[in-house]
Curated annotation (Swiss-Prot):
Glycosylation sites: 161
Protein's recorded name: Taste receptor type 2 member 114
Molecular function terms, GO-annotated: bitter taste receptor activity; G protein-coupled receptor activity
Gene Ontology cellular component terms for the protein in this record: membrane
Signal peptide: none
SUPFAM superfamilies (UniProt xref): Family A G protein-coupled receptor-like
Organism: Mus musculus (Mouse)
TM stretches of this protein: 8-28, 44-64, 88-108, 128-148, 183-203, 234-254, 260-280
Length: 309
């Protein structure tokens, strides 16, 4: 039986999960409709669609595992279920960060202004950059999967009597946690570097505009600022998400820690829902479609009120 606070946190996290699914489903559907109409999907459309789908899967895995852990913990007892959840989590989590990193690099190469020959070379060969990131993702999986397989094979991670039993030292748990999330750390560092370079590009552009006495409210500056806001929002929200996941991992070592688990879950769900709304507001096509849907819903509501009167 859940306490009042646990019930409140579960309701909040469920609402966040629904918001994340709705927002990311909207992003995926808009891009799929564009593909159906144009018979072609742009790079940005492909990245946004992949990011939205991976976030939907991420939310479904988290919320499903949470409800099973709380209400039907005996379902997590079989070792093959633990192994399946672990593999799915690694694939979806790292794929989600991969798409987010690809999105940030795409914006960076399209918007930033640098004359360095490496930047110019990368800008002309953006497809090679994505292939390199795919290679990094595959290598990350190759490092992560054996760690999970060894943990399960050695019976170091079991679910007994409604609680996880971790049979390893804390130092070993930390090392395994780092190895299984190595790809996440790598892509997150790339995103931090990209955001830093975009800020430098904006600063140089503003100085150039000031020296030419052309003012600051030009289109390039606004695009820079909008993109930096999107990247910074992702960084902040993803840090909160990762903190929530880390709290849930800590719960593996603490018996009867449902309240702490709920708090971690609520924190983790802030990222997929809120950032999808930020992407919708930052993308002109997605924003236009969302406004049309809201206007349609408003018209339907007004029509219903007229029929009732």
């Amino acid at each position: 039986m859940l306490s009042t606070m646990e019930g409140v946190l579960l309701s909040v996290s469920t609402s966040e999960a629904v918001l994340g699914i709705v927002g990311n489903t909207f992003i995926a559907l808009v891009n799929c409709m564009d593909y159906n109409r144009n018979k072609k999907l742009s790079n940005i459309g492909f990245i946004l669609t992949g990011l939205a789908i991976s976030r939907i899967c991420l939310v479904l895995i988290l919320i499903t595992e949470a409800y099973i852990k709380i209400f039907y913990p005996q379902l997590l007892s079989p070792v093959n279920i633990i192994e399946l959840i672990s593999y799915l989590w690694i694939i979806i989590c790292q794929l989600n960060v991969w798409f987010a990193t690809s999105l940030s690099i795409f914006y960076f190469l399209k918007i930033a202004n640098f004359s360095h020959y490496i930047f110019v070379w990368l800008k002309r060969r953006i497809d090679l950059v994505f292939f390199f990131l795919i290679g990094c993702l595959l290598i990350s999986w190759l490092f992560s999967f054996p760690v999970v397989a060894k943990m399960v094979k050695d019976n170091k991670m079991l679910y007994i009597n409604t609680s996880w039993q971790i049979h390893m030292k804390k130092s070993e748990l930390i090392i395994n946690y780092v190895f299984t999330n190595g790809g996440v750390f790598l892509f997150f560092m790339i995103m931090l570097i990209v955001c830093f370079l975009l800020i430098i590009s904006l600063w140089r552009h503003r100085r150039q505009m000031e020296s030419n006495k052309l003012g600051f409210r030009d289109l390039n500056t606004e695009v820079h600022v909008r993109t930096i806001k999107v990247l910074l929002s992702f960084i902040i929200l993803f840090i909160l998400h990762f903190m929530g996941i880390t709290i849930n991992v800590i719960c593996l070592l603490i018996p009867e820690s449902n309240l702490l688990f709920m708090f971690g879950l609520t924190t983790a769900f802030i990222y997929p829902g809120c950032h999808s709304l930020i992407l919708i507001l930052a993308n002109s096509r997605l924003k236009q479609c969302s406004v049309m849907i809201l206007q349609l819903l408003k018209c339907c509501e007004n029509g219903k009120e007229l029929r009732d009167t």
